[in-house]
Amino acid sequence: MTLQSLPAPRALTAVSADGTPVHVEVYGPEGAPAVVLSHGWTCSIAFWAEQIRALAADHRVIAYDQRGHGRSPAPAATGGAGYSTTALADDLEAVLAATLGPGERAVLAGHSMGGMTIMAAAGRPALRQHAAAVLLCSTGASRLTAEATVVPLRPGGLRSRLTAAVLGAKAPLGPVNAVSKKVLKYATMGPASAPGRVEACARIVHACPRGARYGWSQVLAGLDLEAGLRELRLPVAVLVGTADRLTPPVHARVMVEALPHCTGLVELAGMGHMTPVEAPEAVTAQIRELTLTYLGVTSGEQEKEKQA
């Protein structure tokens, strides 16, 4: 799962409110309907490779590296000040301003922390101006350590504390090998995940710098974006894997109830947390459905079927 088979992207840098540069890549034809992809914790643009490959033929696909991930450097602020939900929203606003024209609308898709980014930005003028619809994919608004089932204990304070300790560990992840892939698969993917997809996810996650991994883990441990969730007053689809240990389906169901305009909930049987990699066709289909409905886009494949 790489971006090497795609045409070279148009790369640019968006500058966030605190001066942090954000690496952005744009795929697909200029002037095509826009999709903005926001990845999750410890991932990068490469996490969306299958969606970019499928959508870039008839969409302008905008993907960016969250600060501290991929080619976006860590914030200059020390002591964790550069890691916050405000920073997530600032970075997304900067990306929208750098890539979309005045009044231009896009479908936004966020996976895990990328979905939290969209919730954090819900009240921002840029989101209201540019977002036509949203896909919240394998994410949650609050109570992340309380609801996660990575630690195989009954719900309660001990499980929550152990989960926070595991996810917030400062130790390096080490090399990608059979043991590390087994651990990553258990924590983040469904039991039937193909070895190649486990390998791809492991390489992406292990490439995340330790400082960014730890800095963002502290934000996620205390996350509360329930107000932002309720402020997403636009069409929002929700997707989750039934075997997700990091953001179990309880989060998706809470979001469905809280969202002012939820278009539906998709639960993918047997899939874990890494749904864009584990079930790329299903995630891409949800994005296409949103672009068709809210941007009036008909895919090239649908056009061929009509002409046949």
Explain the meaning of each model-derived region.
Residues 39-41, 106, 110-116, 241:
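Conserved alpha/beta-hydrolase "nucleophile elbow" surrounding the catalytic nucleophile
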Residues 20-81, 95:
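Conserved HGGG/HGGXW glycine-rich cap/lid loop of the alpha/beta-hydrolase fold
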Residues 123-168:
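Flexible "cap/lid" loop of the alpha/beta hydrolase fold
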Residues 142, 169-230:
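Conserved alpha/beta-hydrolase catalytic His-Asp/Glu region
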Residues 17, 63-113, 122-123, 285:
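Active-site loop/oxyanion-hole signature of alpha/beta-hydrolase fold enzymes
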Residues 245-251:
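Conserved alpha/beta-hydrolase "acid-adjacent" motif
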Residues 261-308:
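Catalytic active-site module of serine/aspartate enzymes centered on a nucleophile-bearing elbow/loop
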Residues 232, 238-240, 244:
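Short beta-strand/loop motif that positions the catalytic acidic residue
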